């Protein structure tokens, strides 16, 4: 689930209705297998997303950690066996050593699969960033998370949302004192379009590169509270070093 940071501490997320017909919130159903790097993390049920970065490694959010995870690839409808899926258990699950559960700084995790997956048109990797993308860059967010800003509707079909990277100043103004250099906001200050609970760990891909990981936010799709994402470009060395050592 995307972390409802701070609001969860008072017992419930306070979210106001924006449009109860929205997808992801405010997105659309992805074309089948158009996001072949998207994975579902499963522990008897879908609980988080992730991104395939090579044939044996997935990147997700550290707050999605569970001791046992099955990674499901090639999915579109996560409640129907469509024949294209690959289910692989996690062999190693490695949270960033400086992950802070309270602030969600360094909210990134690597999963080594027990065996390499077969890459094809439905299961493919996404590139790590060659550099940090500038504000205004258009990106694709995807996941099977809640599609309502008020209430719960968990979709069967993978949802997509096109959204821009926001200036860091806007991000910091939306969440005073909460944004670190390892976080980036993506979305719309006017609200109405956002990732939500269940999308956590999933990808933000800009120009073919994984620039963000769904991390946290106040509610979903609320005005002046855009989604906050782990800034993947800060972790390329850690990712590469961790893979090499494991």
Curated annotation (Swiss-Prot):
GO terms for biological process: collagen catabolic process; digestion; proteolysis; response to nutrient. One of its GO terms (cellular component) is extracellular space. This is Anionic trypsin-2. Pfam families: Trypsin. InterPro entries: Peptidase_S1_PA (IPR009003), Peptidase_S1_PA_chymotrypsin (IPR043504), Peptidase_S1A (IPR001314), Serine_Proteases_S1 (IPR050127), Trypsin_dom (IPR001254), TRYPSIN_HIS (IPR018114), TRYPSIN_SER (IPR033116). Its cofactor is Ca(2+). Disulfide bonds join 30-160, 48-64, 132-233, 139-206, 171-185, 196-220. It comes from the Eukaryota. Its main location: secreted. Gene3D superfamilies: Trypsin-like serine proteases. Residues 24-244 form the Peptidase S1 domain. It comes from Rattus norvegicus.
């Amino acid at each position: 689930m995307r972390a409802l940071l701070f609001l969860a501490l008072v017992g419930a997320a306070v979210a106001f209705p924006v449009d109860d017909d929205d997808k992801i919130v405010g997105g659309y159903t992805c074309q089948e297998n158009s996001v072949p790097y998207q994975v579902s993390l499963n522990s008897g049920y879908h609980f988080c997303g992730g991104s395939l970065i090579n044939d044996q490694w997935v990147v997700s959010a550290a707050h999605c950690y569970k001791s046992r995870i099955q990674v499901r690839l090639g999915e579109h409808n996560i409640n129907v066996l469509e024949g294209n899926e690959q289910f692989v258990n996690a062999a190693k699950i490695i949270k960033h050593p400086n992950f802070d559960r309270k602030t969600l700084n360094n909210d990134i995790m690597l999963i080594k699969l027990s065996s390499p997956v077969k890459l094809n048109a439905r299961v493919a990797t996404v590139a790590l960033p060659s550099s940090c993308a500038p504000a205004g860059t258009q990106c694709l967010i995807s996941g099977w998370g809640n599609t309502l800003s008020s209430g719960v509707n968990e979709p069967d079909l993978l949802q997509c949302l096109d959204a821009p990277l926001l200036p860091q100043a806007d991000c910091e103004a939306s969440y005073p004192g909460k944004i670190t250099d390892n976080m980036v906001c993506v979305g719309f200050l006017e609200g109405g379009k956002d990732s939500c609970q269940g999308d956590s760990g999933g990808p933000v891909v800009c120009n073919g590169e994984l620039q963000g990981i769904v991390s946290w936010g106040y509610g979903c799709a609320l005005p002046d509270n855009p989604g906050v994402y782990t800034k993947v470009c800060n972790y390329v060395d850690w990712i590469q070093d961790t893979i090499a050592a494991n």
